[in-house]
């Protein structure tokens, strides 16, 4: 399922969305390519080659999460992002780390199901069309009548005609799962009625709708009939095992500093629970067993207070590739505003265009935005590129609010407008702490 790219192509694709951080991009590109290389191997060697997990070190807002998320999207791989601080040691109240893998399996099933739906889309559309014709002319209509109505249907003449359709009521069979204390993963034994009795428990729901609006639910219904659920689950488990990517953020927050006494529930215990996951173990899910040996783990943290060596030595050894991401400079922030395919400025211009308002942002305005963001990051708290969103929202606040009343007009935003909108707030440190 994973799409194959060379490391150079991966870095080039990441460059379209993320500015700078070439070392991190190279590391994840090599890690992704190594997966493909491993899958080409035969025999025992294939099982022996383990992924080289990555530890990204850098302040917030410099692109750590963005790189991992884009990598997974690029590869078409199941991806789950978790925060290390959300988990507690097994035996305490809270989420245990095995839930990470269960979430990954759920995402893999969704990905595989969508892929299989695309494969049967044409057949499902044909079947849906037949059901619409049944609703229009009845199942006993002559072939000539059906052909006549089929022609009108395809030409859109019947789009607004109301019909009644029967579709499966999926909500009635939704699973009710919950954790049993002291039994991690116990929800795997609790299954909904449709899983136990097959389609016996499924209910039919009658809906009144127009011909045009009937196609989507009917195509979904027909797609489900054409899909082999067991095959989807087996393929999803394989995809999660071989292509899955787990991004563990804020891992520095569970690092125990020398001599530090913390009231938090065993940070070291969470690290110890992560060890078998990262090294390779078997996790029980309600869909079956899944091995974590070949899942790629990318951990990240700012390490402002703690340092990577404060992590358990065993966990450090399971994150062999270290990548330091650089704080963003003024030039980086300027490029972030303009260069990515969906840059902030392009987003705001597109949003205002929906109100028929033309937005023009000059080069000196972009310089001013970058200067203010750098200044605020230096004086208050360095939150990286995220500061740009705060500054942009403040600058465009009035235009966004009045846009519906200004259809057909143009706004030119220059450096003077930026400073007028935000200058006093940026200068007042007490105010900017709360507003910017």
From Swiss-Prot:
The keyword Nucleotide-binding applies. One of its GO terms (cellular component) is HslUV protease complex. Keywords: ATP-binding, Chaperone, Cytoplasm, Nucleotide-binding. It comes from the Bacteria. ATPase subunit of a proteasome-like degradation complex; this subunit has chaperone activity. The binding of ATP and its subsequent hydrolysis by HslU are essential for unfolding of protein substrates subsequently hydrolyzed by HslV. HslU recognizes the N-terminal part of its protein substrates and unfolds these before they are guided to HslV for hydrolysis. A double ring-shaped homohexamer of HslV is capped on each side by a ring-shaped HslU homohexamer. The assembly of the HslU/HslV complex is dependent on binding of ATP. This is ATP-dependent protease ATPase subunit HslU. The lineage of its organism: Bacteria, Pseudomonadati, Pseudomonadota, Alphaproteobacteria, Hyphomicrobiales.
């Amino acid at each position: 399922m994973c799409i194959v790219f060379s490391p150079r192509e991966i870095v080039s694709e990441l460059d379209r969305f993320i500015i700078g951080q070439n070392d991190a991009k190279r590391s994840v590109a090599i890690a992704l390519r190594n997966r493909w290389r491993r899958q080409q191997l035969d025999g025992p060697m294939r099982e022996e080659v383990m992924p080289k997990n990555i530890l990204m070190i850098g302040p917030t807002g410099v692109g750590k999460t963005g790189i991992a998320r884009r990598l997974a999207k690029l590869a078409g791989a199941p991806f789950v992002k978790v925060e290390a601080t959300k988990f507690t040691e097994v035996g305490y109240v809270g989420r245990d780390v095995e839930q990470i893998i269960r979430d990954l399996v759920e995402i893999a099933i969704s990905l595989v199901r969508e892929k299989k739906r695309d494969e049967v889309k044409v057949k499902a559309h044909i079947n849906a069309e037949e059901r619409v014709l049944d609703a229009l002319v009845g199942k006993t209509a002559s072939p000539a009548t059906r052909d006549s109505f089929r022609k009108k249907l395809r030409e859109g003449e019947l789009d607004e005609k109301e019909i009644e359709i029967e579709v499966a009521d999926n909500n009635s069979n939704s699973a009710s799962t919950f954790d049993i204390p002291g039994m991690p993963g116990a929800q795997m034994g609790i299954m909904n009625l449709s899983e136990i009795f097959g389609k016996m428990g499924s209910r039919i729901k009658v809906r009144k709708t127009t011909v045009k609006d009937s196609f989507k639910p009917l195509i979904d219904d027909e797609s489900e009939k054409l899909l082999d659920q067991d095959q989807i689950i087996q393929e999803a488990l394989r995809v999660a095992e071989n292509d899955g990517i787990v991004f563990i953020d804020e891992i520095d927050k569970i690092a125990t500093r020398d001599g530090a006494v913390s009231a938090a529930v065993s940070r070291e215990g969470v690290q110890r629970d992560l060890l078998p996951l990262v090294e390779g173990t078997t996790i029980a899910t309600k869909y079956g067993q899944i091995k974590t040996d070949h899942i790629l783990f990318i951990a990240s943290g700012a390490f402002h207070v703690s340092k990577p060596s404060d992590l358990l030595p065993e966990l450090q050894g399971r994150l062999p590739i270290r990548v330091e991401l650089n704080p963003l400079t003024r030039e980086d922030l300027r490029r972030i505003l303009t260069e990515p395919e969906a840059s902030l400025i392009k987003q705001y211009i597109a949003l205002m265009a929906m109100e028929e308002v033309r937005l023009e942002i000059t080069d000196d305005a972009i310089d001013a935005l970058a200067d203010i963001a750098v200044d605020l990051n230096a004086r208050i708290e360095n939150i990286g590129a995220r500061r740009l969103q705060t500054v942009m929202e403040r600058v465009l606040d009035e235009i966004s609010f009045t846009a519906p009343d200004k259809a057909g007009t143009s706004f030119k935003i220059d450096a003077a407008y930026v400073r007028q909108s935000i200058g006093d707030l940026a200068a007042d440190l007490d105010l900017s702490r709360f507003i910017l």
